[in-house]
């Protein structure tokens, strides 16, 4: 028997006395008191953005209104003992009565049994509130409970008590989600307890099971909370450094509702700008730097994805990109492709990340052991002039999904004309234009011009109405050999155009029709014109007079299509864009509103006109709906008259409607159209040079696709460079003059320019004419005693 009755009470049941005050009795709430009423529960759910019965559909995007650590959670099953949203730990403390045989003692025993059932809640509450001593006592109680129960699977029981069954969140995750001054000590206690009970590996690598945060571990949370010391402790304790967080919250599809970082802890540290943790993870032998997520993206893909259009974020992304690439020393890391077949370079181009794209294309590493990681190599420098070799791997059209094709053909990129000004893209396109594209463009212009001339002559010297159509192959004075050859040429060329443009239309994407600079509408008008020509020729050969309608439309479209070839001149290239943009944006909107007015007022005015007499002498020009619409159209263009129609039911009302119509259309709508067209022309004029360059780039690639493979290989740009042993790359030489950057020491490859050949554009392009066609990058390095400056 105990000497004092108080010794029978557990430690948690003792009175607590405040310093200098009277003892305070902490009583435990009844289960009924712990259960919120229906009204109060609904009130708290509304605060957190929940609904009583949430309905999730597959089509609607998820709304992440509930954080990873929420203290307000629904209990739909009726059994809330496993929930990780505990009440205050003080609610579990009760005063032990002095008499063990009294009814209050029996009640205390029952309450003790209830506290054991709520042990999980109390552990979660202790770790979230930073109660170190209480956590030690609770873990000791849990360990004692395991010892008293025989035949118990201790590891499973402990994991059950330390893990929330509804989300898979452990008390370790709970502690990391609620950072406080005691968090480090709590983490140490939990890890020591797990190791002592042989559940460390399961405990530290437990993953979220909730759909939103599925796969997230304690290591991910520690990194996200920027806890470097705790991260190091977790890694040393055996945390999985290659775990993948695949929850919906981390899906790039919902990037505006969540955060995509590449799933792995290393990618998370890199995307949140934590270089110390990145270094810590990369020094760990277990870390797989080349790990790819469920979309095939590696860490470099993830960095490209999180880059934005403001300088601060781009700067840290570039630093992280550099750090990871240099520390890994693995060139293949940047050549890995995701599930869409894109490397980090190609992904930057597809997403329109101009700053990151510029950084990758012009990255130059001067240290000799790591020089193979560069994409730019300075061959020689003399004063302000330097000659650089740009790596064309995945840039030129010789590879699938090349950067050049992605930028030119991806109409979803708003700043693609800006990216085409980057090197080596700008010089590469310029070289292609001068080498073969301008000659092909000129030949195409000549053929189409001759085609239109021939079509016009054949149409002009056709049989007139008073002459019968000849037999298709009857060579008489009405159809000479010259006219027959002309028709055959027109038919053959129109057939070629229809086949070529038909294939182009078939390959068009819906987004191409939304862009003025995609040439989609030119493909349509070229195809329609060719089909009209073919149709008119066959109708004529079979003596159908309806051929004339097709022929007239074909001639009009044929000469209008000559506007396509204005892109060969910078001063005229923007006119076709202006016309397309005015028609598709301004005129179509005007016509929609105008037709509404025209139909409405036409019906109203025609309804006011009385029926015409049989002699039709006093018939009004507004007598029918079609006549009224025609007269209103004349008023719009200033050819109609504002006359009072005496044979109308209400002449004054009729005149009032006419005046209102003129004000709304002739005065208001037409002037609005003129103002909108003026604004469109002004906006296009500001971007005229960039628009012209994008037009020309698309034309160059279209002509390049028409070349046979053997001819395309002859026109391949660049020169073969040896970067390292068995590492040869195709590089483009670009000479640059930078008067603002004088170089006292540059990490270049050759000591002088060597013999060079003059080109038409010496300051931009310089072809090497050295005796060896292969440029060896290890040929020369300067002495180390001079201070090195950036190139």
From Swiss-Prot:
GO terms for cellular component: cytoplasm; lysosome; membrane; plasma membrane; receptor complex. Keywords: ANK repeat, Calcium, Calcium channel, Calcium transport, Cell membrane, Cytoplasm, Ion channel, Ion transport, Lysosome, Membrane, Metal-binding, Repeat, Sodium, Transmembrane, Transmembrane helix, Transport. It is a multi-pass membrane protein. GO terms for molecular function: calcium channel activity; identical protein binding; metal ion binding; monoatomic cation channel activity; monoatomic ion channel activity; sodium channel activity. Its main location: membrane. Residues 95-105 have a biased composition (Polar residues). Expressed in keratinocytes and hair follicles. It catalyses: Ca(2+)(in) = Ca(2+)(out); Mg(2+)(in) = Mg(2+)(out); Na(+)(in) = Na(+)(out); K(+)(in) = K(+)(out). ANK repeats lie at residues 117-148, 170-198, 214-243, 261-291, 298-330, 340-362, 398-420. The chain crosses the membrane at residues 431-460, 480-508, 520-540, 546-566, 570-608, 650-686. SMART domains: ANK (SM00248). InterPro entries: Ankyrin_rpt (IPR002110), Ankyrin_rpt-contain_sf (IPR036770), Ion_trans_dom (IPR005821), TRPV (IPR024862), TrpV1-4 (IPR008347). Residues 621-646 dip into the membrane without crossing it. One of its GO terms (biological process) is response to temperature stimulus. Residues 461-479, 541-545, 609-620, 647-649 are extracellular. Residues 1-37, 52-71, 76-113 are annotated as: Disordered. Homotetramer. May convert from a homotetramer to a homopentamer to allow pore dilation. Interacts with TRPV1; may form a heteromeric channel with TRPV1. Interacts with SNX11; this interaction promotes TRPV3 trafficking from the cell membrane to lysosome for degradation. Belongs to the transient receptor (TC 1.A.4) family. TrpV subfamily. TRPV3 sub-subfamily. This is Transient receptor potential cation channel subfamily V member 3.
């Amino acid at each position: 028997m105990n000497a004092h009755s108080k010794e029978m009470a557990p430690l948690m049941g003792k009175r607590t006395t405040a310093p200098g005050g009277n003892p305070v009795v902490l009583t435990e709430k009844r289960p009924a008191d712990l259960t919120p009423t229906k009204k109060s529960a609904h009130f708290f759910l509304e605060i957190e953005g929940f609904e009583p019965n949430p309905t999730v559909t597959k089509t609607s995007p998820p709304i992440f209104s509930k954080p990873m650590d929420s203290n307000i959670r629904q209990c739909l099953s009726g059994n809330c003992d496993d929930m990780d949203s505990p009440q205050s730990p003080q609610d579990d403390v009760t005063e032990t009565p002095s008499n063990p045989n009294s009814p209050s003692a029996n009640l205390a025993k029952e309450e003790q049994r209830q506290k054991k059932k709520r042990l999980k809640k109390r552990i979660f509450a202790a770790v979230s509130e930073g109660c170190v001593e209480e956590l030690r006592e609770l873990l000791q109680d849990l360990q004692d409970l395991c010892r008293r129960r025989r035949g118990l699977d201790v590891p499973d029981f402990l994991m059950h008590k330390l893990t929330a069954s509804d989300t898979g969140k452990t008390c370790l995750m709970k502690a990391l989600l609620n950072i406080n001054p005691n968090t480090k000590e709590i983490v140490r206690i939990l890890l020591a307890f797990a190791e002592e009970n042989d559940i460390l590996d399961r405990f530290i690598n437990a993953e979220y099971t909730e759909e939103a945060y599925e796969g997230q571990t304690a290591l991910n949370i520690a990194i996200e909370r920027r806890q470097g010391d705790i991260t190091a402790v977790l890694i040393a304790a055996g945390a999985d450094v290659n775990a993948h967080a695949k929850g919906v919250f981390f899906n790039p599809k919902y990037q505006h509702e969540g955060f995509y970082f590449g799933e792995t802890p290393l990618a998370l540290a890199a995307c949140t700008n934590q270089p110390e943790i990145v270094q810590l993870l990369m020094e760990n032998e277990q870390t797989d730097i080349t790990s790819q997520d469920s979309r095939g993206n590696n860490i470099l893909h993830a960095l490209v994805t999180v880059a934005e259009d403001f300088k601060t974020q781009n700067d840290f992304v570039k630093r992280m990109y550099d750090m990871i690439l240099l520390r890994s020393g693995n060139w293949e890391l940047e050549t890995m492709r995701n599930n869409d077949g894109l490397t980090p370079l190609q992904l930057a181009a597809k997403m329109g990340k101009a700053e990151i794209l510029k950084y990758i294309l012009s990255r130059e590493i001067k240290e000799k052991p790591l020089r193979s990681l560069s994409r730019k190599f300075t061959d020689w420098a003399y004063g302000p002039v330097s000659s650089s070799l740009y790596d064309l791997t995945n840039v030129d059209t010789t590879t699938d999904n090349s950067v050049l094709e992605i930028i030119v053909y991806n109409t979803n990129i708003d700043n693609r004309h800006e990216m085409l000004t980057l090197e080596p893209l700008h010089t590469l396109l310029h070289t292609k234009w001068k080498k073969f594209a301008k000659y092909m463009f000129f030949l195409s212009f000549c053929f189409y011009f001759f085609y239109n001339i021939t079509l016009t002559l054949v149409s002009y010297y056709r049989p007139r109405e008073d002459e019968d159509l000849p037999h298709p192959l009857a060579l008489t004075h009405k159809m000479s050999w010259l006219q027959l050859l002309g028709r055959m040429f027109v038919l053959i060329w129109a057939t070629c155009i229809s086949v070529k443009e038909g294939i182009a239309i078939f390959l068009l994407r819906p987004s191409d029709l939304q862009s003025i600079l995609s040439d989609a509408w030119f493909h349509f008008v070229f195809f329609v014109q060719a089909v009209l020509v073919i149709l008119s020729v066959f109708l004529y050969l079979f003596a159908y007079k309806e051929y004339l309608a097709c022929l007239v439309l074909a001639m009009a479209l044929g000469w209008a299509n000559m506007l396509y070839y204005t892109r060969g001149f910078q001063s005229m290239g923007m006119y076709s864009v202006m016309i397309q943009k005015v028609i598709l944006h301004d005129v179509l909107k005007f016509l929609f509103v105008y037709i509404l007015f025209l139909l409405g007022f036409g019906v109203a005015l025609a309804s006011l006109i009385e029926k015409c007499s049989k002699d039709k002498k006093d018939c009004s020009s507004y007598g029918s709906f079609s006549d009224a619409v025609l007269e209103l159209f004349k008023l719009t263009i200033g050819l109609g008259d504002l006359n009072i129609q005496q044979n109308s039911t209400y002449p004054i009302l009729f005149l009032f409607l006419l005046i209102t119509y003129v004000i709304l259309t002739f005065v208001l709508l037409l002037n609005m159209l003129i103002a909108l067209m003026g604004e469109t022309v002004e906006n296009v004029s500001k971007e005229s040079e960039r628009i012209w360059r994008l037009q020309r780039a698309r034309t160059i690639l279209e002509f390049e696709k028409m070349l046979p493979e053997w001819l395309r290989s002859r026109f391949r740009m660049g020169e073969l460079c040896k970067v390292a042993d068995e590492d040869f790359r195709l590089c483009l030489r670009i000479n640059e003059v930078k008067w603002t950057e004088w170089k006292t020491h540059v990490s270049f490859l050759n000591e002088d320019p060597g013999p060079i050949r003059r080109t038409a554009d010496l300051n931009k392009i310089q072809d090497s004419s050295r005796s060896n066609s292969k440029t060896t990058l290890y040929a020369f390095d300067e002495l180390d005693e001079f201070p090195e400056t950036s190139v």
